[in-house]
Amino acid sequence: MEFVTALADLRAEASCPICLDYLKDPVTISCGHNFCLSCIIMSWKDLHDSFPCPFCHFCCPERKFISNPQLGSLTEIAKQLQIRSKKRKRQEEKHVCKKHNQVLTFFCQKDLELLCPRCSLSTDHQHHCVWPIKKAASYHRKKLEEYNAPWKERVELIEKVITMQTRKSLELKKKMESPSVTRLECSCTISAHFNLRLPGSSDSSASGS
């Protein structure tokens, strides 16, 4: 409640008494009150001799106002705080039971459903495993990590194999591009790389005999 009150006071301080919106290009007049530059210009548009304050009716002797950049910065802060306050309120509303208007603090393991204290004691979940949200979150996070662990290991293994094969292919390419390597040596190197037997090799001849 203190935050809400402080935010309301800040908004009042950062609002223009004429348009009742946040101050735009705030200026201060002789009596000390602040207005949007465009609002005070329009308010004094047809005046010539005296210029009354639209808020306190003090008669300013001349059409004079001073730019107030500090108040402009304060206005921007007030805007951001209000936006955050609205977001926080929406988030809090999402975590409140629509039926009992109580905060959702439990989790039903069977129905996979968030519950408020009253829902957790209802007959709908009477014989179900109901845990506090923090305990349920920790449990399911651990289960998810255990499920992902084997897949993570497989991915790492595949990456290692790909890296090794890429390195071997580069080595083979360099060897084949070397001018001192004969065609037979190239064939033998390729066969060894892919674990193949060359036609006409001793094993092939032996099997044919």
Swiss-Prot record:
Gene encoding the protein: TRIM61
GO MF terms held by the record: ubiquitin protein ligase activity; zinc ion binding
Positions annotated to bind Zn(2+): C97, H100, C119, H125
Zinc finger (RING-type): 16-57
Lineage, opening ranks: Eukaryota, Metazoa, Chordata, Craniata, Vertebrata
GO biological process: innate immune response; regulation of gene expression
Organism of derivation: Homo sapiens
Residue spans, zinc finger B box-type: 92-133
Keywords: Metal-binding, Zinc, Zinc-finger
Protein name: Putative tripartite motif-containing protein 61
Coiled coil: none
Listed SUPFAM superfamilies: B-box zinc-binding domain, RING/U-box
GO cellular component, one term: cytoplasm
UniProt-listed InterPro entries: TRIM/RBCC (IPR050143), Znf_B-box (IPR000315), Znf_RING (IPR001841), Znf_RING/FYVE/PHD (IPR013083), Znf_RING_CS (IPR017907)
